[in-house]
């Protein structure tokens, strides 16, 4: 599913690409879901995707506040205590992170074609290192990485801070926002990219409410389905 008019408008103008990470390049969102389901089960509550959608892409403390308030457990568990409890479980899961389908192919393709690429993620440095430790060679192809604990990121998504910081750090930056293509899976991330004035391709989890998807310029079900030439980028040279 895509917006043909938006894709046509962006054709030929993209010079730089920014990737989100969790749920887009790495299959880590399942870890958050698993741990949060365990925590809520103690309070006889269930973790649903409407709540997850509100948390995705945000800074940890912001997501934690949403979690305890929206689930109705804030009187029993503070956002800070939730993060401490969640952290102990996630530490063991993050090093097992797997790449999402199509991620390696797209990153390597853009790198070989000399398209500057980077990451803008809400993940803090300590978690970034754990999540990427099995894939360091691939992630080393990024020109730079902007993380959630970066001093220039005053506000998390949907604020544009992370994406604007990422655009500034490219060689000869800042890059014109209209020439940047962002890949995101989270509703808050899509809004952040649009708030930064950038083009955005959304690769949502199929369980996300479709109402969250009308802001993106293009929607695809997997990075495998992305056609670079639709955005004026060099086409893939293989048929996989």
Curated annotation (Swiss-Prot):
The top EC class is hydrolase
Question: Where found in the cell?
Answer: Cytoplasm
Q: To which species is this protein native?
A: Arabidopsis thaliana
Tissue-level expression = Ubiquitous with highest expression in siliques. Mainly restricted to the meristem of immature flower and vascular elements of the root, shoot, leave, siliqua and developing embryo (at the protein level).
> Which superkingdom is the protein from?
Eukaryota
- Give me the Gene Ontology terms describing cellular component: cytosol; mitochondrion
Q: What is its main location?
A: cytoplasm
Name any Gene Ontology BP term: glycerol biosynthetic process
GO molecular function per UniProt: glycerol-1-phosphatase activity; glycerol-3-phosphatase activity; metal ion binding; sugar-phosphatase activity
Task: Please state how the activity of this protein depends on pH.
Answer: Optimum pH is 7.0.
Q: Which PANTHER family match?
A: 2-DEOXYGLUCOSE-6-PHOSPHATE PHOSPHATASE 2, PSEUDOURIDINE-5'-PHOSPHATASE
Keywords of the record, alphabetical order, are: Cytoplasm, Hydrolase, Magnesium, Metal-binding
Protein name (Swiss-Prot/TrEMBL): (DL)-glycerol-3-phosphatase 2
Task: Give the required cofactors.
Answer: Mg(2+)
> Which residues of this UniProt protein bind Mg(2+)?
20, 22, 185
Enumerate the SUPFAM superfamilies for this protein: HAD-like (SSF56784)
Q: What does this protein do?
A: Acts as a glycerol-3-phosphatase with higher stereospecificity for L-glycerol-3-phosphate than DL-glycerol-3-phosphate.
- Catalytic residues (positions): 20, 22
Q: Which gene encodes it?
A: GPP2
Transmembrane stretches, start-end: none
Per the record, what are the reactions this protein catalyses? sn-glycerol 1-phosphate + H2O = glycerol + phosphate; sn-glycerol 3-phosphate + H2O = glycerol + phosphate
Q: Quote the EC number.
A: 3.1.3.21
Q: What Pfam families does the record point to?
A: Hydrolase
Q: Which family does it belong to?
A: Belongs to the HAD-like hydrolase superfamily. DOG/GPP family.
